[in-house]
Amino acid sequence: RELILTLAVQGKLVPQDPADEPAGVLLQKIRAEKDRLIAEGKIKRDKPLAEIAEEEKPFELPVGWEWVRCDDYFLELCTGPFGSMIHQEDYVRDGVPLINPSHMVGGRIIHDPRVTIKAADAERLSAYALSVGDMVLARRGEVGRFAYVTQQEHGWLCGTGSFFVRLYSQCNREYLGLIFSDVRFRQHLQGESVGTTMTNLNQRILLNALLALPPLAEQSRIVTRVEALMRLCDALEAKGQLEAAQ
């Protein structure tokens, strides 16, 4: 499975198509959208990061791909509320869920009905409300753990141990999920993170991390191919377990 992900994010899993719109075009659209949101006061302008140096690039990219920092790919990266903003007595059962790293399982959100707050508290913390299309990421513990926000989780809240990422509407979040799942990307974040008893990932580390970005059309082909290969892995593992049990 690790090999499949590594080949996928290095452009070695599906053939390139010269007719695909280059990744640089998508990056221009993202930049224009960020500029619009900044001008409207909806997001803040990030502090500029350094240009990508040649020695930072871990491998050579196929034609049409681009190296990009997460800062230039995300519309917005937000950290969950400080622990002081939510107290133990604020928790109720079956209220508005708070999403912490332990609730991110296999790219899905599995919430705990005991980790929820009243609607009034959720309104107070509305700046941390999740929207359809967002991704939530762990910033404590298992670095690289993530989940997709669907219609069911719209309006739920990012917890104190998490980030949430807002993406441009045309971005393929499933491809970004492949990058977050790749062992090389996770090891990079782990190596940059701080903490002795528990790993802590800060915004600067994540925003500075590099993504190998294919053309949008190729991203879709890669995701489809990876999903098919992972299903095959599941079937082979299930067959092996069945044979071992007999």
Located regions from the model:
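Non-catalytic DNA-recognition/assembly elements of restriction-modification systems
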Residues: 1-3, 7, 12-13, 53-81, ...
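Terminal amphipathic helices with adjacent charged low-complexity linkers/tails
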Residues: 21-25
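Sequence-specific dsDNA recognition surfaces
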Residues: 51-56, 71-88, 102-132, 151-152
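Short, well-ordered beta-strand elements within core beta-sheets of diverse protein domains
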Residues: 58-60, 163-168, 207-213
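A short beta-sheet element
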Residues: 100-101, 119-181, 194-195, 200-202
